[in-house]
Amino acid sequence: MTSFAWVTFTQSLAGVASSVFAPLIAAITLGLSARGAFTARIARNESYNHAGNAVAAILAGVLAYFWGPVAVFYLMAAMALASVAAALRIPADIDLDRARGLAHDDPAAAPQPVPLRQLLDNRPLVLLAVSCALFHLANAAMLPLVSQKLALANPALATPLTSACIVAAQFVMIPAAMAVGRYADRLGRKPLLLIGFAILPLRGLLYTLSDDMAWLVAVQLLDGIGAGIFGAVLPLMVLDLTHGTGRFNASLGAVTTVFGIGASLSNGLAGLIVQHAGYRAAFLALAGIAGLACAALLALRETRVADATPTTPASA
């Protein structure tokens, strides 16, 4: 079935599934992790995630080249079944209290999660959400804009070059995520996330310097560093700010929703600027928004507190 309504429906289902995947994996990982092991495991998860994305993209390109685009759908179906089989192997003995970030220092007490409205008083968490929303408002449109510029300059190579950008960036994300697992507990979360955020305005500025095909693809590789760090650090920071509240899952989902809104607005904003002022102005505007994201993150304190297990939301 190839009707617009059917495609829209299936894509909506895919959007729902992808939006809950990362928070669910983070919660399961937390519920299965020993104390102090969450950082390494979440970084490992992200590394495997990016490796899987890269391999899937390569396989999709090869299959599409030899058997046409329809082969990609069979590949995705096979991978989905393999994912289900892997999910069935996840141990069932998940500590549900730990998975939701609920601490109980008194074993005799029955811990209860804090009211959801109390999370709105968690100013660092709100500031983190705003920072992430600005980051994705600036970031989401950059690859589409680069793809459009590549298509204008090299119509015959636009699709292969865009695919190369995506695959190469995914490979860069692997060591970036692994670095989070190694350094997040030593250096703190904020310095690493600042590195990821600071790369974004740099990318926006670098895109304006040249329309050369090799230059655009090379600059896009920087996206792998920022995205690799972001995906691994965000769950750690949310856990830091909500530990003991029992609302880790809700908070991570809320932050994900907020930055998803930023990402959804990004392409429309960039397209409007391109229409009225051109690509250079669009990249500069996105770089400016990325700068605001960096400024907001600078206002956030370091979230990691060694050997601390707060029972109420962190305060500014």
Where are these regions (language model features)?
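Cytoplasmic helix-loop-helix junction between adjacent transmembrane helices
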Residues: 10-51
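Pair of pore-lining "gating" transmembrane helices in MFS-fold secondary transporters
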Residues: 122-141, 221
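Short amphipathic helix-loop junctions that connect adjacent transmembrane helices
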Residues: 144-160
